Amino acid sequence: MKGVVTSMTISEMAKALDLERLSGESDREIESCYISDLLSRVLGGCSPDDVWITVQSSLNMVAVAIMIDVSCVILPEGLTAPDNVIEKANEEGLTIFTSKESAFSLAVKISKIIN
């Protein structure tokens, strides 16, 4: 369909959603988004090139995100990550953002701008 965006870059999404970048410089494409805080569910349900929205801000979150090869991670509700997590994410090339919005609101907006 003409005028329908089927994917967009991380930078385009960040600008559209007014996200604050905590780590990473990647500008990968995003295909969809996935919301979960239970790492075992994320391993089974999140796909490469997804945006992962989670309140998890531990080193385990970074490991799971890298294992799945997500496009980026968004921490909702103004959450941030400890320095050691940001440092590890930068080492691994993982882009992490924070947003003041809820996970639900972010997912709805992402769905609207990529579909």
What are the residue ranges of the model-derived segments?
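Feature captures the catalytic cores and cofactor-binding loops of soluble hydro-lyases/lyases
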Residues: 28-30, 39-51, 56-115
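Short, structural beta-strand-to-alpha-helix junction motif
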Residues: 7-11, 102
